[in-house]
Design a protein with these regions (language model features):
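Second-shell loop/turn segments in exported
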Residues: 146-158, 166-170, 191-200, 216-227, ...
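Solvent-exposed, polar/charged alpha-helical surfaces in well-ordered, non-transmembrane soluble domains
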Residues: 165, 169, 181, 232-239, ...
């Protein structure tokens, strides 16, 4: 009961803050959260929670998705305390473990966003002017933050020991650098059961349409949860994205945000590189790409820019 009370208080505080920031009324915000949850979350999974817990988790996931797709990285930090309360709640039930596995892989985003909030000062404004949001860090600043954070984290995810050696040859067979198997650490923490609130699943967090596009079956067994088929599809997708954008940073940004989003930003800002659009990408993607760079450096001593292009 105690964790439920704490969780509801955190959710309420988060909702109030959001309502104040965007001039949205509390009933409207709650209704938006419920509508998003109905459209995206697997209610059969969440039904294992109490009614109070289920509503709180739905609202939290809705808020997190909204901040992930938002403009400012620092805004994600507002949900850090809530996430720390939601995670153990999801871990209490076998049925909600897939969401717990996904959320656990997200916690570093919340920590780094909070560090940005602390270290980057808000933009100064004139007298009697409303405060401006904390600006997004540059792409290089993000890389530096992630390299610093990951330099203190040497232990492999437990499941990585089981999968890395098995899946690297699959990436090589698809003509993709085998080091990119570590995308799974960022996507799912190497937990093949991970399920995101948006519907991405498995080690490599493939959405249903993407999975089918690259040869996976979702019925009668969802192959996204099977390590080898999901690795094949992920490698094929990464190869396709690099063939399109000719750059691993842009390919990874597209893997996370969608190739249409990346293409539109390149055109809008007349850019030809990741750094040229980084500060305009969705907040999650702004952290996703440098996080993968840091993981590759930590696990393989590899530089993303120096990874070879996929072979024909």
């Amino acid at each position: 009961m105690k964790i439920v009370v704490i969780l509801v208080l955190f959710i309420a505080a988060s909702l109030v803050a959001r309502a104040q920031d965007d001039s949205i009324t509390m009933p409207e915000l709650v209704q938006n959260a419920q509508q998003w949850a109905q459209e995206n979350l697997d209610t059969n999974v969440l039904n294992s929670l109490s009614d109070v817990d289920e509503r709180a988790v739905q609202q939290f996931f809705s808020e997190l998705e909204q901040e992930y797709q938002g403009e400012y990285v620092v805004d994600i930090a507002s949900l850090r305390d809530t996430a720390q309360s939601v995670l153990p709640l999801l871990e209490t039930q076998d049925e909600t473990h897939p969401y717990a596995a996904w959320l656990k892989a997200q916690m570093d985003y919340l920590d780094v966003a909070d560090e940005i909030r602390i270290t980057i000062p808000p933009t100064e404004t004139g007298t009697n002017q409303p405060p401006q949001p904390i600006p997004n860090p540059s792409a290089q600043t993000e890389r530096d933050l992630w390299f610093k954070k990951d330099s203190t984290t040497n232990a492999w995810p437990v499941s990585a020991k089981e999968y890395v050696a098995e899946l690297k040859p699959i990436f090589s067979a698809q003509k993709v650098p085998p080091e990119l198997v570590w995308v799974a650490e960022v996507e799912s923490g190497f937990d093949r059961h991970a399920l995101s609130p948006a519907g991405a699943a498995g080690l490599f967090q493939l959405m249903p349409d993407t999975a089918k596009r690259f040869g996976l079956s979702l019925w009668p067994r969802d192959q996204r949860y099977q390590p080898e088929p999901s690795a094949i599809a992920s490698a094929r997708y990464l190869k396709y994205l690099h063939d399109r954008f000719k750059d691993w940073r842009l390919a990874l940004a597209s893997y996370n945000a969608g190739e249409g989003t990346v293409q539109k930003l390149l055109e809008r800002y007349n850019a030809n590189s990741y750094d040229g659009i980084a500060e305009h990408l969705p907040a999650e993607t702004q952290m996703y790409v440098p996080r993968i760079e840091a993981v590759l450096k930590l696990r393989e001593g590899a530089n993303l820019e120096q990874l070879s292009a996929p072979l024909s």
